[in-house]
Structures are given as C-alpha cells and as structure tokens.
C-alpha cells in the first residue's frame, strides 16, 4: 500500500505534536499509549483521504486522534475519560497556539458515551461542516 504524500506529511506533523506536546495521565498503560493514538491518527488520516475530507476536517480528526485517550485513569471502561480529554484539549488550546474546534471537543467528550448522544451533539453544530463524519 502506498500512503499518499499528503497523509504522510499530516501524519509526521501531528505525530511530532503528539510526542512533544500531549501529556498522558496514565503513564504505565499497556493499551492506551501515545503509540495507540499514533495508530488512530494514521487510520483517521487514511480514512479521511479515502472520503475526500477537507483540510479543516482532517485537522479536526488529527486533533481528536492525538488527544482522545490522554486523560485515561485506567485501561478498562473508564467512563469520563473522553470528557477529561476534551477539557484537556480545550485548556491546551487556551494556553498554546492550537486553534480550538468545538467539534473536536464534542467528539472527545462523547468518545466513551452512547454514539446517539455524540451524534446529536455534533448535529447541533451550525458551522456548515458535518461533524458526523468526524464522529
């Protein structure tokens, strides 16, 4: 499989960001590691490429991928880790140069909840870009 150049470039940039900027609460995890988030990042970019998503949608997917499991407290169900990751993302954006995207916040906040609730929250977005493809 040949990985498209745009996917490679986005992956390298966001992987570097993940390694340098995103701190994980559960440092001794065997499952939910930076490597796990890097795999999610790669698969998200490959799917986004196949779907023909816009740059803005790809950037949102990348941000969600690198932050989504950063605030886990255990490797099991850990209901609430999505909201904690969303809050971490929001706080990070406030104090750094990463632009905040409410769709990214919602994708993470509902990451460990019923999909129907997350899809409903994203549907309420009025940005002209479907959040459903990000969820």
Regions found by a protein language model. Name each.
Residues 57-135:
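Divalent metal-dependent catalytic cores for phosphoryl transfer on phosphate-bearing substrates
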Residues 1-78, 82:
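Acidic/His-rich, divalent-metal-binding segments that scaffold phosphate/diphosphate chemistry
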